[in-house]
């Protein structure tokens, strides 16, 4: 069959090529090389755990296609610049803030799964590991820090589509409940969990992590990976985790915070942090010290804290992967492709605006790491005190 097709169509292709001008042939070859090169680059850089979601099938998650433009307009208007130059949400009510986080994840979930990984976090990579392995190691560390053991009831605070929760449940034998505000992420989490055969070990629950539908003292341990930064106030989510944990239980967190090197009087520092806030749906950027004070304020005992991004000098930095995406042109090409698909109606109208919002912050994330002014993985290991006898 293949030989027959070749015999039939090859002469026609050659004949058609002979009728083309040299510049047309050169343009065609160049286009083929560029497109083929891009496909190879993004295949190499994307996680081997990527999903089947296509660039041309990115959606607004739980937002209907014709409503994406309206929600994007609301997202843009949600931010304002303070007198000190810092970008923050101007919402007065917690309800509005929660709504905007939900909107952000409606818009970004498909893109994260397609272009990043099914674990929505950064990680530092050992030289012998690939990206997916580094992600798993990052998740294993927090399970160890939270003292998770077989049979425990554990809560994953801000679970996304659930991959860290599934990883930790698989490796520890614990039963993990993952909480996310976003209904579309619940749908995706259930899809992945069923596919992994872990429905009896990991359960996603749609809820606001500042107001969870669980009884007091009902969990043996808790962890959060780059998620609590989305809370309107850190005290609100930390207090709720404190409530649902049993006395003596541990809560381990990777918190996204600015570091001591951040200078609020440095214009470039402020621009970078503002970009991270806007491109990641964060109410505002907390400092490492503010996160520490928030946990202590609600009653937790702090065992220790450190920046996991600086813990070892032999690991590739957490910004290695985004730096590769920028340097290879994947970010620029993807934004361009999404813009074209937006214009011709393949993607929801104004989805390109959102892609630009997220894509523009990636070079700034790299610079924030290189300057040492931000980390997505400041470790805090908290413990709820035992009840006094």
Swiss-Prot record:
Enzyme class, broadest EC rank: transferase
A single GO BP: methylation
Entry membrane topology: Single-pass membrane protein
Pfam families per the UniProt record, alphabetical: Methyltransf_11, Sterol_MT_C
Cleaved signal peptide residues: none
Gene3D superfamilies per record: Vaccinia Virus protein VP39
Alphabetized InterPro entries for the sequence: Methyltransf_11, MeTrfase_SMT, SAM-dependent_MTases_sf, Sterol_MeTrfase_C
A single cellular component GO annotation: membrane
GO molecular function: S-adenosylmethionine-dependent methyltransferase activity
UniProtKB keywords: Endoplasmic reticulum, Lipid biosynthesis, Lipid metabolism, Membrane, Methyltransferase, Microsome, S-adenosyl-L-methionine, Transferase, Transmembrane, Transmembrane helix
Localization per Swiss-Prot or TrEMBL: Microsome membrane
Keyword presence, Lipid metabolism: yes
Stretches that traverse the bilayer: 25-45
This enzyme's EC code(s): 2.1.1.-
Superkingdom of source: Eukaryota
Family assignment from sequence similarity: Belongs to the class I-like SAM-binding methyltransferase superfamily. Erg6/SMT family.
Function: Unable to convert squalene, botryococcene, cycloartenol, zymosterol or lanosterol to mono-, di-, tri- or tetramethylated derivatives.
PANTHER family according to UniProt: 24-METHYLENESTEROL C-METHYLTRANSFERASE 2, PTHR44742
Official protein name in the record: Sterol methyltransferase-like 1
Species assigned in the record: Botryococcus braunii (Green alga)
Protein's gene: SMT-1
């Amino acid at each position: 069959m293949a030989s027959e097709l070749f015999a039939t169509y090859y002469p026609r292709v050659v004949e058609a090529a002979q009728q083309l001008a040299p510049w047309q042939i050169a343009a065609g070859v160049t286009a083929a090389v560029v497109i083929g090169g891009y496909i190879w680059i993004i295949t190499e850089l994307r996680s081997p755990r990527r999903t089947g979601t296509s660039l041309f099938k990115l959606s607004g998650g739980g937002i209907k296609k014709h409503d994406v433009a309206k929600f994007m307009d609301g997202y843009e208007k949600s931010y304002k610049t303070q007198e000190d130059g810092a970008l923050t949400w101007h919402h007065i009510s917690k309800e509005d803030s929660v709504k905007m986080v939900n909107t952000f994840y409606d818009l970004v979930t498909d893109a994260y799964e397609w272009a990043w990984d099914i674990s929505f976090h950064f990680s530092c990579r050992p030289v012998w590991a690939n990206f997916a392995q580094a992600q798993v190691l990052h998740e294993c560390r927090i399970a160890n820090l939270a003292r998770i053991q077989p049979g425990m009831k554990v809560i994953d605070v801000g679970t996304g589509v659930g991959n860290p929760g599934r990883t930790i449940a698989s490796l520890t034998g614990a039963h993990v409940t993952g909480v996310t505000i976003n209904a579309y992420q619940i749908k995706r989490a259930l899809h992945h969990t069923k596919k992994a055969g872990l429905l009896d070990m990991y359960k996603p629950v749609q809820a606001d992590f500042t107001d969870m539908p669980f009884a007091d003292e009902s969990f043996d341990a808790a962890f959060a990976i780059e998620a609590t930064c989305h809370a309107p106030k850190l005290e609100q989510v930390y207090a709720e985790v404190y409530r649902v944990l049993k006395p003596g239980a541990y809560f381990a967190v990777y918190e996204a915070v600015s570091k001591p090197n951040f200078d609020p009087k440095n214009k470039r520092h402020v621009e970078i942090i503002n970009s991270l806030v806007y491109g990641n749906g964060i109410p505002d950027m907390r400092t490492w010290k503010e996160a520490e004070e928030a946990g202590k304020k609600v009653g937790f005992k702090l065992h220790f804290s450190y920046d996991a991004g600086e813990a070892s000098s032999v690991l590739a930095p957490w910004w290695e992967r985004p730096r590769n995406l920028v340097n290879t042109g994947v970010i620029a090409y993807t934004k361009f492709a999404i813009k074209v698909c937006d214009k011709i109606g393949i993607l929801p109208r104004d989805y390109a605006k959102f892609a630009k919002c997220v894509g523009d912050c990636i070079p700034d994330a790299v610079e924030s790491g290189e300057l040492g002014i931000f980390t997505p993985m400041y470790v805090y290991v908290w413990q709820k005190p035992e009840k006094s006898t």
